[in-house]
A protein has these predicted regions:
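Short, surface-exposed ligand-recognition loops at beta-strand->loop->(often short) alpha-helix junctions
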Residues: 9-19
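An amphipathic, aromatic/His-enriched active-site/gating alpha helix that lines ligand/cofactor pockets
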Residues: 24-36, 55-89
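Active-site-flanking beta-strand signature of metal-NTP-handling nucleotidyl enzymes
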Residues: 3-8
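Glycine-rich beta-strand-turn "strand-cap" elements at beta-sheet edges
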Residues: 2, 39-51, 76-98
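Short hydrophobic/aromatic beta-strand micro-patches
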Residues: 9, 53-55
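Generic recognition of short, well-ordered alpha-helical segments
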Residues: 17-20, 51, 67
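Residue-level signal for secondary-structure boundary sites
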Residues: 16, 60-62, 97
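Feature marks short, surface-exposed loop/turn motifs that line or immediately flank catalytic pockets
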Residues: 12-14, 44-46, 60
Length: 98
């Protein structure tokens, strides 16, 4: 299992619109093969910041399976205009879990 990590910067005045758009977008990503689950969290200390964590079976499921899918174009249309700056996306493998 791979964990995708992205810190999303969104204008706080757009939070409700962003969250509504993300609610639609989650149906797109959840249909991608080898997607496991995602969590979107809103930062309590910094209202412009969200943390997106997505679990995939492997990196290629995200970088190829999702990003090269027809659904990714719709995902981009729904969400990318909210990000300023555009987020860095990284992938992690579990070392230790309790």
């Amino acid at each position: 299992m791979i964990l995708e990590h992205a810190v999303l910067q969104v204008d706080p005045s757009q939070s409700a619109r962003f969250e509504a758009a993300f609610d639609v977008a989650r149906t797109i990503i959840s249909e991608v093969p080898r997607f496991i689950r995602l969590r979107l969290s809103h930062c309590l200390e910094s209202p412009e910041r969200y943390l997106l964590l997505v679990e995939w079976e492997d990196v290629e499921s995200h970088t190829i399976g999702f990003r090269q899918s027809t659904g990714y174009e719709k995902w981009r249309e729904l969400l990318h205009h909210f990000y300023e700056p555009f987020p860095t996306v990284e992938h992690y493998s579990t070392v230790l879990e309790v």
